[in-house]
């Protein structure tokens, strides 16, 4: 049976959503199906307005209950970084998964990461490393991007770009004005590679 996949993301200025949609495209091109969910916002509208954050995309449902993820085999997730770790919105979501941790509901499921930072050296790799603790506590199997299909992109130093072997990524700029580059979007081929990897598993 084909794996059931959900991409979960939090995006302030839309950069992570752009990556999420590109990852979903890769999964579909590989023959898979995927659902997208937004992690709920924790900032007030007043703060978001001062940050010049655009409105959320209401066509993508919020994941209001972690139980929803129990219905999926794999859930790659994307988020910006805050001090080299999950932002508060993601931390709040994970803090609500105590029931799943207690019952092992996420044990043996698969996940990958894609990350947005403001600048080069802004925490893409440290955020991925920090995420390993949460994934390990849940028994979630991490599938990295790796070099197999991306060495020609990750090894190209002709321009500044996000992403690493841990997963796809982008730089937003301190004010959110920089959009994902063509090369960063090419690295969301991670979606296709992830699907091909987990499709080898016999999900029952």
UniProtKB/Swiss-Prot annotation:
The keyword Cytoplasm appears for this protein: yes
Family matches, as InterPro entries: Flavodoxin/NO_synth, Flavoprotein-like_sf, Flavoprotein_WrbA-like
Span of domain Flavodoxin-like: 5-195
Keywords recorded for this protein, A-Z: Allergen, Cytoplasm
Localisation: Cytoplasm
Family annotation (SUPFAM superfamilies): Flavoproteins (SSF52218)
PROSITE patterns to which the protein is assigned, alphabetical: FLAVODOXIN_LIKE (PS50902)
Predominant location: cytoplasm
CC per GO annotation: cytoplasm; membrane
Family: Belongs to the WrbA family.
PANTHER family reported in the protein's UniProt record: FLAVODOXIN-RELATED PROTEIN WRBA-RELATED, FLAVOPROTEIN-LIKE PROTEIN YCP4-RELATED
Protein's name in the database: Minor allergen Cla h 7
Organism: Davidiella tassiana
């Amino acid at each position: 049976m084909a794996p059931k996949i959900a991409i979960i993301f939090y995006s302030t200025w839309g950069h992570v959503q752009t990556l999420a949609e590109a990852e979903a495209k890769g999964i579909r091109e590989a023959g898979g199906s995927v659902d997208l969910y937004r992690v709920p916002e924790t900032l007030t509208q007043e703060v978001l307005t001062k940050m010049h954050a655009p409105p959320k995309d209401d066509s993508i449902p919020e994941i209001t209950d972690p139980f929803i993820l129990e219905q999926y085999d794999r859930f790659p997730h994307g988020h910006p970084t805050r001090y080299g770790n999950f932002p508060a919105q993601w931390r709040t979501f994970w803090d609500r998964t105590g029931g799943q941790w207690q019952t092992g509901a996420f044990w043996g499921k698969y996940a990958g990461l894609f990350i947005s930072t403001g600048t080069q050296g802004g925490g893409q790799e440290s955020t991925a490393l920090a995420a390993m603790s949460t994934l390990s506590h849940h028994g979630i199997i991490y599938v990295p991007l790796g070099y197999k299909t991306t060495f020609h992109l990750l090894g190209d130093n002709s321009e500044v770009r996000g992403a690493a072997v841990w997963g796809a990524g982008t730089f937003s700029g301190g004010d959110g004005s920089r959009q994902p580059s063509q090369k960063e979007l090419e690295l969301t081929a991670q979606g296709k590679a992830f699907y091909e990897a987990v499709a080898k598993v016999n999900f029952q």
